UniProtKB/Swiss-Prot annotation:
GN (gene name): secA
Cofactor(s) essential for the protein: Zn(2+)
Function: Part of the Sec protein translocase complex. Interacts with the SecYEG preprotein conducting channel. Has a central role in coupling the hydrolysis of ATP to the transfer of proteins into and across the cell membrane, serving both as a receptor for the preprotein-SecB complex and as an ATP-driven molecular motor driving the stepwise translocation of polypeptide chains across the membrane.
Record: residues binding Zn(2+): C916, C918, C927, H928
Protein's UniProt name: Protein translocase subunit SecA
Oligomer and partners: Monomer and homodimer. Part of the essential Sec protein translocation apparatus which comprises SecA, SecYEG and auxiliary proteins SecDF-YajC and YidC.
Length: 932
C-alpha cells in the first residue's frame, strides 16, 4: 500500500527512467536542424571525428546525443525512415545495457541501429544476435546501407560459412548472426591449434533481438559440439518391442496401499515428462529381456553388467509414452525431426539427448543414427554473460523481468508506444471439450470472414493446426497454414496475413520477426517488381504506384472491419508466449482484437487447474456448447501459468548453478589453452611438469625421508624403464654407497631425465621440439577435457540421489567435480610427460611431420555434430549439424584419437594470487593454476 502511494507521487522506476531519457531526446532533437544542414560527405565524416574523440578518451555516454542525431539523419536519407522519439529512448536503454520491451511494429530493427552505431565507434566490435539465419541476413542487408553510408563495415555470420568468411565477418565493425552460431564459434575457437585459426575477437557488446526467446526459452538447452560414440543401434531396435507389451498403471499408490485405480507396469508423470517402472513392471521387463537373451536367466536389471540396459528400457518407454508424432516431432524424408515447443518450427538437425532420439527413430522404424560424445559445451546463460556489455529487445519481457535481473543482471524498461494501442483483449472462453471449443473457433472465424476482417489463429502444435485446417476445409473457408512444415513460405504468408478476409493458422510464434501490415504488405510486392529486369522503368513506377493506391483502399477497409483479429486455440504454459500472439494485432496504433478459446482437455488446464474449473461448470450445470467467460477463471489460468513459469525459472536457475561449476573449470582450461597457443616457448611449463611427475614416480617407491629398508628399488627401476625410457642402475648406486639418501636417488633420476630430454632437443633443435610439445600438450588437454566432460555428465545424472543420504546434491556435485578436475590436471601432466619422454626421434623432419599431422587433424573434424541439447531433461532438443569447421586430432604416436573444433573468444584472465574460480578457497596458483 505504501509502495503504491509512493509510486503515485514519484512514479515507478520505469516511468522515472523514461522521463530521464526524454531529457536526452530533447538534446538530440535540438541538434537536428544543425545536422540536417550537413552534406552527405560531411555527415559521413562525423564517424571519423567521433572515432578520434573516443580514441582521445571521450566516453560513449558523452558522445551519445551527437551520435544518435547523426544516425537518425543518415537513416532518414538512406532508408527514408526517421527514428521516433520513443525509438531514441529504446536506443538509449540498449546502450546502457538494459532490455527494451517494445510492442510489435514499433521498429526494433531500426532502434538497434542507434546503440550499434555508437558502440561500433570504439572499434572493438558489436554483435547483433537474432534467432535464425533468415532474420540475420535480412536485417544485415537492410541496415548495411545505413552503416556503410556512415563508413562502418558490416559482416554476416551464418551457419555453414567458410572459415575465411567468418574471420572477415567478425573483423567488421558490426556483425549480425544467430545465437547458435556465435556460441559454436566461441567453442570452436577454443579447440584450435593456431592463434590464426580463431575467428572471434573479444566479446565486447551484444544486442540480442527476441531476447526472451534466446535468454529464457533456450537457456535450458546447452550448445554442444559432439562426436560419435559407441554404436548401440541393434539394442534400440530390440528394446522397441518392449513398451507395447507393458501396461500403464492408473493412479499412484499411497502409504496405506490405496490410490491405484488400475494396476500396471509403469506410471507417467506428465509434469516432469518422466516414466517409471512399477515393481511388477520390473519383473515383467526382466522376464522378457531374459527370453530375448539380453540378460541372464534370473538376473536383475540393476546387476552391474545390466545397468546400461536400464538406460535403453527407459528411453524406449519415454519414446512410446511421452513423445508423440506430429506433436513433439514429425517424420520427414526418413528422419525424425523435432518440433520446437515454443515456436512450432521444425528444428532440422537437432536431436534429443540421452538416447531418446534413437529410441524414437526405432519406434518410427527409420534409420537409427549413432549416439554422440560431448567434445565441448556451453549454455547461452554462460556465453552471453561473458560479454563486457549485453542488451536485448523484445515485445514481451516484463513478465520475465525478475529472471532477467536475477540471472543476467539486466534491467527491463518498458518503452512507451509511438501511438496509443487500440487492441481489445476479450475474456477467455472455456468449454468442457475440445470439440465444443473448435466449434466456437470456427463460428468466430466465419463471422470475421463474412465481415472482411483478417484472422490469425494461433495453435500450440502442428497436429492442432492441421486439425483446424481440416475443420475449415469442411465448412469451405479458404485459409493458409503456417507451421513448421511450410517454413520456406513463412515470411510470404505472414506478410499477406493482414489482407481482407485472410485466414491464417500459425503454430505459436511461427513468422515472428515479420510484421503483419493491415491491407497486406505492398512493400514486399513492390520489391519483386523492382527486382524484375524485364519490366521497363516507367512501367515499374506505374505498377508500384498502383500497388500503393490499392493498398491504401485495402488498409482502410481492414481498419473499418476492426483490424487483425487474433484467436488463441489454447493457452501456452508461459504468459509471455500468449502475449506474443496477442501482440501481432494492434501494431502502430492500428485497431485489433484478441480472444483465447480453451477446453478442459488442454494440458495446462488438465494438469494445473482442471478440477477447479470443472467443478465450477458442474455447479452451474452448463449445457453442452456453452462457455464460461469469467474473470475468476481467467485469473485461475494465469495463476497456473505463473506456477509453471516459476517452476521453469527454478529449473533454469538450478541448471545455471550446476553449469557454473563446469563453467569455472572451462574458463581455467580455455585460459591455459590460449596461453599455450600464444606462448613462444613452453620449455618451462614442460620442465615443471616433468619434474613434478618424476618426483611422484620416485616417491612412490622411495618415500621422502625414508630409510633403505623401506625402498623398492627393483620396482622403481622397472617403472622408469617401462614408462619413462630411463634405464638406470639405481640398485648398483645403493650397493656402492652405504650412506645414499632418498633425495640423492631423486636427484640422480631427475638429472637422467633432464639429460635425455636435452639430447632429444639437441637432435632436432629447440624450435622444432617446442612446436611438437605444444601440439602434444594441446591434444592431451583437449582429449582429457573431453573425457572430463563425459565424467561430469555421468556425475550429474546420479547426483540427486545423494539427497536420500541427507547430503546437499549441489555441494556434493561441486566437491566431486573439483576432485575430478584436479585428477584431470594430474593426468594431463602425466600424459604429456610420458609422450615427450617416450617419443623416438629419427630426424627433425619426422618430428615436424608428426606435429603438422596433429595440427592438421586438429583443424578438420569428421563425424562432428553441433548440438543444442538439454541436460535438464532428455526431452529437450539437441542441434546436430555435420561440421565443416571443427577438429579432430589423432596421432598414433601421441595416443588415442581426439575430436575437436574451430574458433573462440578470449577468457578473462585469472591472476595467480586471485582466489581459484572453482570455489575451493585456495589461491589459483596453488589450485587449478598448477598446470601453468
Amino acid at each position: 500500500m505504501t509502495t503504491g502511494f509512493l509510486q503515485k507521487i514519484f512514479g515507478s522506476r520505469n516511468q522515472r527512467l523514461v522521463k530521464q531519457y526524454q531529457k536526452t531526446v530533447a538534446t538530440i532533437n535540438a541538434l537536428e536542424t544543425q545536422i540536417e544542414k550537413l552534406t552527405d560527405d560531411q555527415l559521413r565524416g562525423k564517424t571519423d571525428e567521433f572515432r578520434q574523440r573516443v580514441a582521445a578518451g571521450e566516453s560513449l555516454d558523452k558522445l551519445l546525443p551527437e551520435a544518435f542525431a547523426v544516425c537518425r539523419e543518415a537513416s532518414r536519407r538512406v532508408l527514408k525512415m526517421r527514428h521516433f522519439d520513443v525509438q531514441m529512448i529504446g536506443g538509449m536503454v540498449l546502450h546502457y545495457g538494459k532490455i527494451a520491451e517494445m510492442r510489435t511494429g514499433e521498429g526494433k530493427t531500426l532502434v538497434a541501429t542507434l546503440p550499434v552505431y555508437l558502440n561500433a565507434l570504439a572499434g572493438r566490435g558489436v554483435h547483433v544476435v537474432t534467432v535464425n539465419d533468415y532474420l540475420a541476413q535480412r536485417d544485415a542487408e537492410w541496415m548495411a546501407r545505413l552503416y556503410n553510408f556512415l563508413g562502418l563495415s558490416v559482416g554476416i555470420n551464418l551457419s555453414g560459412m567458410e572459415h575465411d568468411q567468418k574471420q572477415q565477418a567478425y573483423a567488421a565493425d558490426i556483425t549480425y548472426g544467430t545465437n547458435n552460431e556465435f556460441g559454436f564459434d566461441y567453442l570452436r575457437d577454443n579447440m584450435v591449434y593456431e592463434t590464426d585459426a580463431r575467428v572471434q575477437r573479444a566479446l565486447n557488446f551484444a544486442v540480442v533481438d527476441e531476447v526472451d526467446s534466446i535468454l529464457i526459452d533456450e537457456a535450458r538447452t546447452p550448445l554442444i559440439i559432439s562426436g560419435q560414440a559407441e554404436d548401440h543401434t541393434e539394442l534400440y531396435v530390440r528394446m522397441n518391442a518392449l513398451p507395447p507389451l507393458l501396461e500403464r498403471q492408473i493412479g499412484e499408490e499411497k502409504a496405506d496401499g490405496t490410490g491405484v485405480e488400475k494396476p500396471g507396469d509403469y506410471t507417467l508423470d506428465e509434469k516432469a515428462r518422466q516414466v517409471f517402472l512399477t515393481e511388477s513392471g520390473h519383473e515383467k521387463a526382466e522376464r522378457l529381456l531374459a527370453e530375448w537373451g539380453l540378460i541372464g536367466e534370473g538376473e536383475s536389471l540393476y546387476a552391474p553388467q545390466n545397468i546400461t540396459l536400464m538406460h535403453h528400457v527407459y528411453a524406449a518407454l519415454r519414446a512410446h509414452t511421452l513423445f508423440h508424432k506430429d506433436q513433439h516431432y514429425v517424420v520427414q524424408n526418413g528422419e525424425v525431426v523435432i518440433v520446437d515447443e515454443f515456436t512450432g518450427r521444425l528444428m532440422a538437425g537437432r536431436r534429443w539427448s540421452d538416447g531418446l532420439h534413437q529410441a524414437v527413430e526405432a519406434k518410427e522404424h527409420v534409420k537409427i543414427q549413432s549416439e554422440n560424445q560431448t567434445l565441448a559445451s556451453i549454455t547461452f546463460q554462460n556465453y552471453f554473460r561473458m560479454y563486457a556489455k549485453l542488451a536485448g529487445m523484445t515485445g514481451t519481457a516484463d513478465t520475465e523481468a525478475y529472471e532477467f535481473n536475477e540471472i543476467y543482471g539486466l534491467e527491463t524498461v518498458v518503452i512507451p508506444t509511438n501511438r496509443p494501442p487500440k487492441r481489445i483483449d476479450k475474456q477467455d472462453q472455456i468449454y468442457k471439450t475440445a470439440k465444443e471449443r473448435y466449434d466456437a473457433v470456427i463460428r468466430d472465424i466465419r463471422d470475421c470472414y463474412e465481415r472482411g476482417q483478417p484472422v490469425l489463429v494461433g495453435t500450440t502444435s502442428i497436429e492442432n493446426s492441421e486439425l483446424l485446417s481440416h475443420l475449415l476445409k469442411q465448412v469451405g473457408l479458404p485459409h493458409e497454414v503456417l507451421n513448421a512444415k511450410q517454413h520456406e513460405r513463412e515470411a510470404a504468408i505472414v506478410a499477406e496475413a493482414g489482407r481482407p478476409k485472410r485466414i491464417t493458422i500459425a503454430t505459436n510464434m511461427a513468422g515472428r520477426g515479420t510484421d503483419i501490415v493491415l491491407g497486406g504488405n505492398a512493400e514486399k510486392q513492390a520489391a519483386f517488381i523492382e527486382a524484375d529486369d524485364a519490366i521497363p522503368a516507367d512501367e515499374k513506377a506505374r505498377r508500384i504506384q498502383k500497388l500503393h493506391d490499392e493498398w491504401e483502399t485495402l488498409h482502410e477497409e481492414v481498419k473499418a472491419a476492426g483490424g487483425l483479429h487474433i484467436i488463441g486455440t489454447e493457452r501456452h504454459e508461459s504468459r509471455r508466449i500468449d502475449n506474443q500472439l496477442r501482440g501481432r494485432a494492434g501494431r502502430q496504433g492500428d485497431p485489433g482484437s484478441s480472444r483465447f478459446y480453451l477446453s478442459l482437455d488442454d494440458p495446462l488446464l488438465r494438469i494445473f487447474a482442471g478440477d477447479r474449473v470443472r467443478s465450477i461448470m458442474d455447479r452451474l450445470k452448463m449445457p453442452e456448447g456453452e462457455a464460461i467467460e469469467a474473470g475468476i477463471v481467467t485469473r485461475s489460468i494465469e495463476s497456473a501459468q505463473r506456477k509453471v513459469e516459476a517452476r521453469n525459472f527454478d529449473i533454469r536457475k538450478q541448471l545455471l548453478e550446476y553449469d557454473d561449476v563446469s563453467n569455472d573449470q572451462r574458463k581455467v582450461i580455455y585460459q591455459q589453452r590460449n596461453e599455450l597457443l600464444e606462448a613462444h616457448d613452453i620449455t618451462e611449463t614442460i620442465t615443471a611438469m616433468r619434474h613434478g611427475v618424476i618426483t611422484e614416480v620416485v616417491r612412490q617407491f622411495v618415500p621422502e625421508g625414508s630409510i633403505e629398508e623401506q625402498w623398492d628399488v627393483p620396482e622403481l627401476e622397472e617403472a622408469l624403464r617401462n614408462d619413462w625410457q630411463l634405464d638406470l642402475a639405481i640398485q648398483e648406486m645403493v650397493n656402492e654407497s652405504s650412506s645414499i639418501t632418498a633425495e640423492e636417488i631423486l636427484d640422480a633420476v631427475m638429472t637422467a631425465a633432464d639429460e635425455q630430454y636435452e639430447a632429444k632437443v639437441a637432435m632436432v633443435g629447440r624450435e622444432s621440439f617446442s612446436a611438437f610439445e605444444r601440439s602434444v600438450m594441446l591434444q592431451t588437454v583437449d582429449r582429457l577435457w573431453r573425457e572430463h566432460l563425459a565424467a561430469l555428465d555421468h556425475l550429474r545424472q546420479g547426483i540427486h540421489l545423494r539427497g536420500y543420504a541427507q547430503k546437499n546434491p549441489k555441494q556434493e556435485y561441486k566437491r566431486e567435480a573439483f576432485e575430478l578436475f584436479a585428477a584431470m590436471l594430474d593426468a594431463i601432466k602425466q600424459e604429456v610427460t610420458r609422450i615427450v619422454m617416450n617419443v623416438q626421434i629419427q630426424s627433425p623432419e619426422q618430428l615436424e611431420e608428426a606435429a603438422e599431422q596433429i595440427e592438421e587433424r586438429g583443424g578438420h573434424l569428421e563425424n562432428v555434430e553441433y548440438q543444442h541439447a538439454d541436460y535438464a531433461d532428455a526431452g529437450a532438443p539437441v542441434a546436430n549439424v555435420t561440421a565443416a569447421a571443427a577438429a579432430t586430432a589423432t596421432a598414433d604416436m601421441v595416443g588415442s584419437a581426439m575430436t575437436h573444433s574451430g574458433p573462440g573468444g578470449e577468457m578473462p584472465k585469472v591472476g595467480r594470487n586471485d582466489p581459484c574460480p572453482c570455489g575451493s578457497g585456495k589461491k589459483y596458483k596453488q589450485c587449478h593454476g598448477k598446470l601453468s
